[in-house]
């Protein structure tokens, strides 16, 4: 169901929705809020303004028996985010506790898009039947516009407990944290050697984020994932003596072939000479010269 619209706010009042009864449900069910009228939104859009929620008040008034048990969970979602990341703030309180919930937005939104904020409730661990009209909700919104967005100081959600039998120990509320942001600068091997940094050249199919995570800095080498992808990228920082693989396989093979020869060339020549002489002496018959008488 879409959020209802109402007259635009001014600096001193809030847009109030009707105090309506809601049925008990174990699933997230939308609480209808009223926002500025379509005409007011178009007027702000034509003036190229953006909008934010300065303050949101959700009034909860229970109408269950005194022995009713269970917890009510109220959540604010920003539909600009994916479904598993849209939750911005949540409150959990006893089903019998009358309470006012306060929320302060920390971001602007464009009026060219649908109003992104949605308010939901659900009931858990209760002994009250489903579809019972267990409570009334009423929303109050104070919005503002600006020519452009600015940084908004963070204000945590708060509560105002109206039932005396309950205290802060019975209430829980939370707010989403700032999104994590990590950047790593690239340093090539040649530039990091001299402490220089050069521009990053992107090629087709590459992105700034992926390109700028490649480097040889010490911080980049700390990532286990990066080390698994590029296990040898930092070998250039080792000395040449460590990187020298030694003699090649061919040199080692030749050395092994020559390892059984322990004679010098002169010794080899002497062996050949003596062998030849021995063969001549053994195979040739010496003839005594005849004398002439």
Curated annotation (Swiss-Prot):
GO BP: exit of virus from host cell nucleus through nuclear pore; transport of virus in host, cell to cell
Molecular functions per Gene Ontology: DNA binding
Signal peptide segment: none
Recorded superkingdom: Viruses
Membrane topology field: Peripheral membrane protein
Localisation: Host cell membrane; Host microsome membrane; Host endoplasmic reticulum membrane
Keyword set, alphabetical order: DNA-binding, Host cell membrane, Host endoplasmic reticulum, Host membrane, Host microsome, Membrane, Phosphoprotein, Transport, Viral movement protein
Family from the record: Belongs to the begomovirus movement protein BC1 family.
Assembly description: Binds to dimeric supercoiled plasmid DNA.
Function: Transports viral genome to neighboring plant cells directly through plasmosdesmata, without any budding. The movement protein allows efficient cell to cell propagation, by bypassing the host cell wall barrier. Begomovirus genome is shuttled out of nucleus by Nuclear shuttle protein (NSP) and the movement protein transports the DNA-NSP complex to cell plasmodesmata and facilitates further movement across the cell wall.
Name recorded for this polypeptide: Movement protein BC1
Organism: Bean golden yellow mosaic virus (isolate Puerto Rico)
């Amino acid at each position: 169901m879409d959020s209802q619209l109402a007259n635009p706010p001014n600096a001193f009042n809030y847009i109030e929705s009707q105090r309506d009864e809601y049925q008990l449900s174990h699933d997230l069910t939308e609480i209808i809020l009223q926002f500025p009228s379509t005409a007011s939104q178009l007027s702000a859009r034509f003036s190229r303004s953006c909008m934010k929620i300065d303050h949101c008040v959700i009034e909860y008034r229970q109408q269950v028996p005194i022995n009713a048990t269970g917890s009510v969970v109220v959540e604010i979602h920003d539909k600009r985010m994916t479904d598993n990341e849209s939750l911005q703030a949540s409150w959990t309180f006893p089903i019998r506790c009358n309470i006012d919930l306060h929320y302060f937005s920390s971001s602007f939104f464009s009026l060219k898009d649908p109003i992104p904020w949605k308010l939901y409730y659900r009931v858990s661990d209760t002994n009250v039947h489903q579809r019972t009209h267990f409570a009334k909700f009423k929303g109050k919104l104070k919005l503002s516009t600006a020519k452009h967005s600015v940084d908004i100081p963070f204000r945590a959600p708060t509560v105002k407990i109206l039932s005396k039998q309950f205290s802060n120990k019975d209430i829980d509320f939370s707010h989403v944290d700032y999104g994590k942001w990590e950047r790593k600068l690239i340093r090539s091997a040649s530039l990091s050697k001299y402490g220089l940094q050069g521009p990053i050249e992107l090629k087709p199919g590459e992105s700034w984020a992926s390109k700028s995570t490649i480097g040889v800095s010490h911080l980049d080498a700390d990532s286990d994932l990066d080390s698994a992808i590029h296990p040898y990228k930092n070998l250039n920082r080792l000395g040449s003596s460590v990187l020298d693989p030694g003699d090649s396989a061919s040199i080692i093979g030749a050395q092994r072939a020559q390892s059984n020869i322990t004679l010098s060339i002169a010794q080899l020549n002497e062996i050949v000479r003596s062998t030849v002489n021995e063969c001549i002496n053994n195979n040739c018959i010496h003839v005594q010269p005849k004398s002439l008488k």
